[in-house]
């Protein structure tokens, strides 16, 4: 999850820089704020989709009640492997 957190921070920083430096420079223009809000909402939506996919796969494949260690990249779950077939 650290990788997703760092990825999210990098994407938000990149969007912030793009919005500040590449949007119209008119003083009365609200385009900068609108574009930043749209990009920020898109990023939150992406995180929500990834969260739903991870929860779905976790519910489908694993029961976190005991069994053995499953080593994921940097994270260890103590769980029992279970496949709904």
UniProtKB/Swiss-Prot annotation:
Keywords: Kinetoplast, Mitochondrion, Ribonucleoprotein, Ribosomal protein. It is found in: Mitochondrion matrix, Kinetoplast. The keyword Ribosomal protein applies. Its main location: mitochondrion. The keyword Ribosomal protein applies. GO terms for cellular component: kinetoplast; ribonucleoprotein complex; ribosome. It holds the Pfam family Ribosomal_S12. It comes from the Eukaryota. Belongs to the universal ribosomal protein uS12 family. Protein S12 is involved in the translation initiation step. This is Small ribosomal subunit protein uS12m.
């Amino acid at each position: 999850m650290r990788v997703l957190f760092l990825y999210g921070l990098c994407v938000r920083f990149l969007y912030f820089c793009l919005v500040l430096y590449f949007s119209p420079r008119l003083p009365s223009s609200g385009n900068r704020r609108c574009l930043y809000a749209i990009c920020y909402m898109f990023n939150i939506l992406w995180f929500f989709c990834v969260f739903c996919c991870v929860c779905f796969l976790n519910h489908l494949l694993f029961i976190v009640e005991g069994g053995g260690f499953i080593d994921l990249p940097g994270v260890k779950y103590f769980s029992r492997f279970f496949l709904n077939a």
